[in-house]
Amino acid sequence: MIEITAEIRALIDKAAAGVELAGDEYIDPADGLIHCKKCGGQRQTVVPCFGKSGYFMPRCICQCQREAEEQRKAAEERQRRMERIKRRKAQGLQDRYLYDYTFANDNGKNPLMDKARAYVENWKEAYKNNTGLLLFGDVGTGKSFFAGCIANALLDQDVPVLMTNFPTILNRLTGMFSEDRSEFIASFDEYDLLIIDDLGVERSTEYAMEQMFFVIDSRYRSRRPMIITTNLKLAELKNPPDLAHARIYDRILERCAPILFDGKNFREENAGATRQTAKDIVNSKQD
């Protein structure tokens, strides 16, 4: 900081004569410069003129102005992040019901959910090592909910995730030219995590198997993790019926650690609760 000499002070006092102060500012008699009433910091400084003699007194920001600016920028960044997450959820969770697949909505009945939480907690390591999951087991045992909880939790952390299924993918590919299909499949690599739900429900036509292979192989080559859910048994995946299935399943088994879902049918349990609620409604009497 420049020492305020008598010469400089005279220049400061001359400049101060015509200055307009804001309501939270005052001129400090000690140095003649503009200060903040709140923090007492300088809002004016003394700078030597470059290349010639003399000085000028530009405005500067005080501590509380600096903090206010940092808070404003932080608030703007939070807003941008929220909007970005909202867009990513709209893109990554293509079915609205998936928004409800969250850890907050977990009823605690499935002990495997601890593994879902662990996957999220160790996501950086999983991503670095291209570690995926293969969730297999009977219908209604919570595989999709497990995967959806991971998807929502990572999306909330601003991680790009896509949760989809092969019928949806194949429907989108129908009618596309070869170049467009390649671009569409390559677009999956924009997501740090790709979740394919219900592998095995799609029709096993030659065209479908070829496109499924392209999707899985593209993901395999990108070295980015994927999570697969399926009602198929592990033995079926390890002993595929033909070469077309083998090419797909081998890549999945290499990249995805298998987790067996062999508990109760939660979907049937929920359906029973729904039936009871409906029964209570239709049998109730108005007063």
Regions found by a protein language model. Give the residues of each.
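A short, basic N-terminal segment
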Residues: 1-107, 269-287
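Pre-Walker A (pre-P-loop) alpha-helix and adjacent loop at the N terminus of AAA/AAA+ ATPase modules
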Residues: 93-133
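Short glycine-rich substrate-engagement loop in P-loop NTPases that contacts/grips substrate
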Residues: 111-120, 128, 151-191, 203-210
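Walker A/P-loop nucleotide-binding motif
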Residues: 127-147
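Hydrophobic/aromatic beta-strand patches that form the interior of the parallel beta-sheet core
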Residues: 133, 162, 195, 227, ...
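Loop/turn-to-beta-strand initiation segments
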Residues: 159-160, 190-193, 222-228
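Walker B catalytic acidic pair
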Residues: 198-199
